[in-house]
Amino acid sequence: MKPSDWLILQKKVRFGDCDSAGVIHFHNLLKWSHEAWEESIEIYGIPCNDIFPDFSIRKSQIIFPIVNCEANFNAPIKIGDLLKVKIAPHKINTHLFQVNSFFIKNGNKVAEGKIIHCSLDVDSRNKIEIPDQLERWIEASNVSTNLKEC
């Protein structure tokens, strides 16, 4: 498997994604950004339940709350648009990581989402190190070289 398999995804804009002006409602960009990194880690081989806790079975002792997010729009995104979504994760420090999502339409960047997550112990809510499997995904994604290839 090559990095582009989990770093480049597709998103089709649907009617329900848009507002009355016929362009995507702003909050959907952040939703799509989060969904894209979820899909990316699954394609990479990390089961979703290993990252996102199911409190009924308590499989995970780690949570990743969003501590900062941002959405930037460069051009309208409309119903029916087919977007390429490029994922660019990177580690900020031992407990913080950022996932950037670049939304490309016809070769042009039309939007960008940035989400920063903090790695916390589920019970104490203390900061803890990013787990190994997630760290491996970030390292394997190697944004500085692989994003150019994508």
UniProtKB/Swiss-Prot annotation:
GO terms for molecular function: 1,4-dihydroxy-2-naphthoyl-CoA thioesterase activity. Its EC number is 3.1.2.28. Catalyzes the hydrolysis of 1,4-dihydroxy-2-naphthoyl-CoA (DHNA-CoA) to 1,4-dihydroxy-2-naphthoate (DHNA), a reaction involved in phylloquinone (vitamin K1) biosynthesis. The keyword Hydrolase applies. Transmembrane segments: none annotated. InterPro entries: DHNA_CoA_hydrolase (IPR022829), HotDog_dom_sf (IPR029069). Belongs to the 4-hydroxybenzoyl-CoA thioesterase family. DHNA-CoA hydrolase subfamily. It comes from the Bacteria. It holds the Pfam family 4HBT_2. The lineage of its organism: Bacteria, Bacillati, Cyanobacteriota, Cyanophyceae, Synechococcales. It catalyses: 1,4-dihydroxy-2-naphthoyl-CoA + H2O = 1,4-dihydroxy-2-naphthoate + CoA + H(+). GO terms for biological process: phylloquinone biosynthetic process. This is 1,4-dihydroxy-2-naphthoyl-CoA hydrolase. Keywords: Hydrolase. It is an enzyme of class 3 (hydrolase). Pathway: Cofactor biosynthesis; phylloquinone biosynthesis; Quinol/quinone metabolism; 1,4-dihydroxy-2-naphthoate biosynthesis; 1,4-dihydroxy-2-naphthoate from chorismate: step 7/7. The active site is at 19.
